[in-house]
Amino acid sequence: MGQEVRYRVRGGHALHGTAFIQGAKNAVLPMIGAALLASKGRTVLRNVPVIEDVRRALELAEYVGAKVEFHEAERTIVIDATGLNDPNRAVLPASIASRFRGSVLFIPALMHRMGRARIEGVGGCNLGSRNLDFHYRGFARLGAEVTEDPERKHINVKADNLKGGRLYLDTPSHTGTENLIMAAALTPGTTVIEHAALEPEVLDVIEFLGSMGAKISGGGTGFIKVEGVSELTAVEHTVMPDRIDTGVFAMMTAATGGDVSLVGANLDHLGVARWKLEQMGVQFTQQGAVLRVRRDPNVPLRPINAVTSPFPGFATDLQPPLMALATLAEGESYIREAIFDGRFALADELNKMGAKIEVEGNRAIVHGPSELHGTKVTAHDLRCGAGAIMAGLVAKGETIVSPAYQVDRGHSHFATRLSALGADVVREEVS
């Protein structure tokens, strides 16, 4: 029998103190892919989150021929991609890609450096009908030849005759926007991306690529223009703070009635989530690079209505922890998931703990307040796992959340950081 890695949470402890917010997962992953576009120099990325998705990305980078150093204690990555020239290594193997959805972010580098790419599987969070077709349609619009085998075992991309073109995203996906910008950066001619994402992470990736020599304009407007250049050069860059990490810690502080200072957090990056949390009774104070979050435990949380939408709207990645927080509010909360279907997996787990949540299609009705009780729950995906741990912080008794891997994909040293704030959280291996 193999080892199970899980989180064990004992509730009843308010969070107090100081926590450091990690670098942004959704910025560093495309930056690792973009670093492979550099034919000169060594890329240095700082403020890198020590998470499983970063480790998978670096495994892929090494697999295709890059030299990689991950200095975890310093949260720094060094990537030398000057040796990416063997077309036989232009493969993203299922052994890694099936566990790591961000593997699609490596296709632009393989297209430009090796002339082709093959992806044998995609992984990450299981979110309903979410798929990657729009990435491949974008590559094809730039002149790539994209073919899929009959049994969907892998996808082949050939890039012999790339040229700039006009691209349109049906939904303003941050991953899709970043990927198409990377594909366009070394493609001859002018590429225009309409309905592009506005997320802060996209702007950080654009800044990174611009430092490398890419010619990109229109970031933050939804209409991005890329003038192809002949080469990109490696640079040093500090990754922005993770706004989802910020939101999760803010909600955990609110749930426990705590008072926490989040170092490196940026309140503006929360978008609508900031206003929704304030409506519930959460207080924010930004002083320089420190965001103070507090909630009076003697004042009940107010119920909320929230609809997920692209930035600056309410982030879909914060919807599961918001659901957990809403179980504590006095009254009915209504949450509509407008980005991904199948993202209410946490509802069943919270109901096991004593919550009263009804799911009707893409809408959840949370009847609060509920007294939560610890039990064994499943982390169906990364954000579901974070929401379950959050519920465990306020539940009576002990909550077991597994597999830990899902949470580890997106939150670095989660148990350590929570324990430093007074929580009783342990990440453990059991037979």
Swiss-Prot record:
Name of the top EC class for this enzyme: transferase
UniProt entry tagged with the keyword Cytoplasm: yes
Pathway noted in the entry: Cell wall biogenesis; peptidoglycan biosynthesis
Keywords: Cell cycle, Cell division, Cell shape, Cell wall biogenesis/degradation, Cytoplasm, Peptidoglycan synthesis, Pyruvate, Transferase
Signal sequence coordinates: none
Localization of this protein: Cytoplasm
Cross-referenced CDD domains: UdpNAET
Pfam families, per the entry: EPSP_synthase
Reactions that this protein is recorded to catalyse: phosphoenolpyruvate + UDP-N-acetyl-alpha-D-glucosamine = UDP-N-acetyl-3-O-(1-carboxyvinyl)-alpha-D-glucosamine + phosphate
Active site (UniProt): C125 (proton donor)
Entry GO terms, CC: cytoplasm
Gene3D superfamilies given in the database record: Enolpyruvate transferase domain
Gene Ontology biological process terms in this record: cell division; cell wall organization; peptidoglycan biosynthetic process; regulation of cell shape; UDP-N-acetylgalactosamine biosynthetic process
Residues given in the record as phosphoenolpyruvate binding sites: K25, N26
Keyword Transferase: yes
E.C. number: 2.5.1.7
Family per similarity comment: Belongs to the EPSP synthase family. MurA subfamily.
Protein name: UDP-N-acetylglucosamine 1-carboxyvinyltransferase
Organism: Thermobifida fusca (strain YX)
